[in-house]
Amino acid sequence: MQTNLSQLIKVARGEAKADLVLLNARVVNVFNAEIEPANVAVFGGQIAGVGDYTLGNRVLDLKGAYLLPGLINGHTHVESSMLDISQYARAVIAHGTSALITDLHEISNVCGKEGIDYVLSASADLPLNIFLQVPSCVPATHLETAGAEINSNDVTELLRLPNVTGLGEMMNFPGVLFGIPSVLDKIEAASGKVLDGHAPGLSGKDLNAYISAGIHSDHECIQLDEAKEKLARGMYIMIREGSSEKNLTELLPLVTDKTYKRCIFVVDDRSCADLQRDGDIDAVVRKAIKLGLDPVRAIQLASINTAEYFRLNGHGAIAPGYLANMIVCQDLNQLDIDMVFHKGELVAEKGQVLFKPQSHVPKSLLSSMHIKPFDIKDLAIKGSSTQMPVIEVIPGQIVTRRLNLKIPAENGVLTPDIEQDLLKIVVLERHCQSGNIGRGLIKGFGLKKGAIASSVAHDSHNVIAVGTNDADIYTAVKELERINGGIALVVDGKISASVPLPVAGLLSTQPLEKVVDALEEINKQAAGLGCKLSAPFATLSFMALPVIPELRLTDLGLVDVNAFKLIPQET
């Protein structure tokens, strides 16, 4: 180690050869927001210096191209890509992502610590720095049934692992406000670490209380005033632009000369199709520039700001002693990525990675569908013609509205009304064969016939389905059992399309291109059935998440998120 350090210093002083010298670069300096013409010397995976270096074992003339730090995705759930970790890395590295911070509460809610071990092990040899925020909400709440539990003792143990930066998003904000001991125990276990927040709509004294617990970020702002208040109270605002959650346009005015150091770009949840077509965090940077943000500032929000918040020493800048994670592009406004370096090695060029992804999935993660046998009649909503809560989807958002509508009944059973876009929604517990089935109605999917179903249902990932009739819903759920998890579409009792996701019912074992093609086909078929949503399965996956207002459905029933309680229903 001392030998390497001594040699690094010699290279920095110009007394020894660098491993790599990049000539004639226009270096994006994230410290002073300037573009600096310079050469860059790299040794041992680190940047030795920025200046007039020419002596190197390898010399590459960039001919005036821009050189910027590798991008850092400040908050994401890699499982939302539906890709095996090696394929996920293949998708994002080509788009300039050099590091990311992930909260693995998706796979953890199904498989517990074994899921975390799989991701960390599978990513160990990839040219991508993956940092973990220990999942704080496994299970997310008491209002649903998860497949595992991570308690405060587990949090303490996991925080000792390498590349663990802190405690993941505290979604159970009511648990914080009400002082639930198990919630506070996890917060105390992570004292001194980075604590991520999840506080949709919190303001005033409740916001003060939440922040006072030591939680200093939030990625759930959807209104500018909300973001301004949270920033003023000391929070870092993670400006999110994902597949279903698109908040960049609304929140970008928050970024000013006075506030930008407290702002970070994130994607939260991004589908593999969006990763392939538009990119990862680079897509957020690109869109921000198109919306008028200065390119260098946009890069700061996806590099140094993120690194400093998460205390990632050596990440996020092109400067002496920093990791040589770098991007080469010709046009900063377009962020057209030519080359990606990781620790000084060229790992992607012209959109193609230069390494071979290898998948290693434990067999124990390939069998996670444990639904108690049920009949079509078990899906019925019993009741008389009366007012009942109905979930309304808001396009482009994961928050929902609660409607109270009079629903017709036939023979003591409440029925969907396709003409009014009132469809059946069900959630079936899939972890321990409890037989729990949540039933409700939802508005906004637009299906005129058939049903869609998914074993991806944040955050406990039970099976969720929406359809025009119980028979098609039943068939779709049975298809998910057959393929060991995934998504399915059924029309007139026949399986029209399905995408297997056998790894915990969340991830595919297929290459990126095959998964994207399959998803595009099933989404196209959903549109053909009248679905109004651009990402129907991504939207469906959030309808069971009882920590996002206003109304949700879990395997235990309808949840009033604002009151944080189940809504009584007839049985």
From Swiss-Prot:
GO biological process entries: adenine catabolic process
GO molecular function: adenine deaminase activity
Entries under InterPro entries matching the protein: Adenine_deam (IPR006679), Adenine_deam_C (IPR026912), Amidohydro-rel (IPR006680), Metal-dep_hydrolase_composite (IPR011059), Metal_Hydrolase (IPR032466)
Transmembrane segments: none
EC number: 3.5.4.2
Known cofactor(s): Mn(2+)
Any Pfam family: Amidohydro_1
Alphabetical keyword list: Hydrolase, Manganese
Reactions the enzyme catalyzes: adenine + H2O + H(+) = hypoxanthine + NH4(+)
Coiled coil residues, start to end: none
Annotated family: Belongs to the metallo-dependent hydrolases superfamily. Adenine deaminase family.
Protein name: Adenine deaminase
Provenance organism: Dehalococcoides mccartyi (strain ATCC BAA-2266 / KCTC 15142 / 195) (Dehalococcoides ethenogenes (strain 195))
